[in-house]
């Protein structure tokens, strides 16, 4: 028995109506979904840390999620694991005609352009009414914003130069500050303008070839790393963070930044 068949057999036993695991038998697509998201982020974290031993385990956990969904779908007569494998295999062959058919592609740019063209044709066959119809609402907000913008760009609704993109960011900053400076701040309006600013910033990232979600993740990690070092230095001075003034913390923060730059 190969390892995939072993895993499928384990899943079947876990869901066995009579002798299976009580917890696994109770689960549904909806109850498992949050675990899928959690496992996905754990995979990303292992990649970011370049911990490949951990990555192997996390990928296994993520694969188990797929097997879990396949088992539940099979029980309901919808599809099984083989159907999932067939669907992705068909899609990969269909979207790589330069490998599996008589088409050709000279570089990655041509591959991506053809990929998007094929996806557009597939959406048309599904009778979707908008280029945005199948963008998951459950995506992280920055990632979803970038995908929305990319779809719009694919049909020509996009600036072709960087200047207007940058101007839009400054325009949205002005609108945020206008709302923030009102005598009575309308929080709903301020939130709306902040959203517009974030959306415009994501668009700038997209035009610069950067993935906004990844960029913010890295910024979070950098800030966390530096702040932990500030805490360490302050503690080494025999002080508590809550008892240190902002000026001192800023001085330590700049020290930490210089240390990183010098490395």
Swiss-Prot record:
Q: Which InterPro entries match?
A: MazG-like_dom, NTP-PPase_MazG-like_C, NTP-PPase_MazG-like_N, NTP_PyrPHydrolase_MazG
Write down the chemical reaction(s) this protein catalyses: ATP + H2O = AMP + diphosphate + H(+)
Q: What does the UniProt keyword field contain?
A: ATP-binding, Hydrolase, Magnesium, Metal-binding, Nucleotide-binding
- Result when mutating residue 222 to A: Loss of pyrophosphohydrolysis activity against both ATP and dTTP
Pfam families with a match to the protein in the record: MazG
**What's a single GO MF annotation on this record?**
ATP binding
Q: Regulation of activity: what does the record state?
A: Inhibited by the MazE-MazF complex.
Q: Where does ATP 1 bind?
A: 168-172, 175, 189-192, 196
BP term (GO), one: UTP catabolic process
Residue sites binding Mg(2+) per the record: 172, 175, 193, 196
Gene3D superfamilies linked:
MazG-like (1.10.287.1080)
Q: Entry's CDD domains?
A: NTP-PPase_MazG_Cterm, NTP-PPase_MazG_Nterm
Consequence recorded when altering residue 226 to A: Loss of pyrophosphohydrolysis activity against both ATP and dTTP
Cofactors required? Mg(2+)
Cite the EC number: 3.6.1.8
Sections of the chain in a coiled coil: none
- Chain's role: Involved in the regulation of bacterial cell survival under conditions of nutritional stress. Regulates the type II MazE-MazF toxin-antitoxin (TA) system which mediates programmed cell death (PCD). This is achieved by lowering the cellular concentration of (p)ppGpp produced by RelA under amino acid starvation, thus protecting the cell from the toxicity of MazF. Reduction of (p)ppGpp can be achieved by direct degradation of (p)ppGpp or by degradation of NTPs, which are substrates for (p)ppGpp synthesis by RelA.
Q: Which NCBIfam families match?
A: mazG, PRK09562.1
Q: What is the protein name stated in its UniProt record?
A: Nucleoside triphosphate pyrophosphohydrolase
Q: Which gene encodes it?
A: mazG
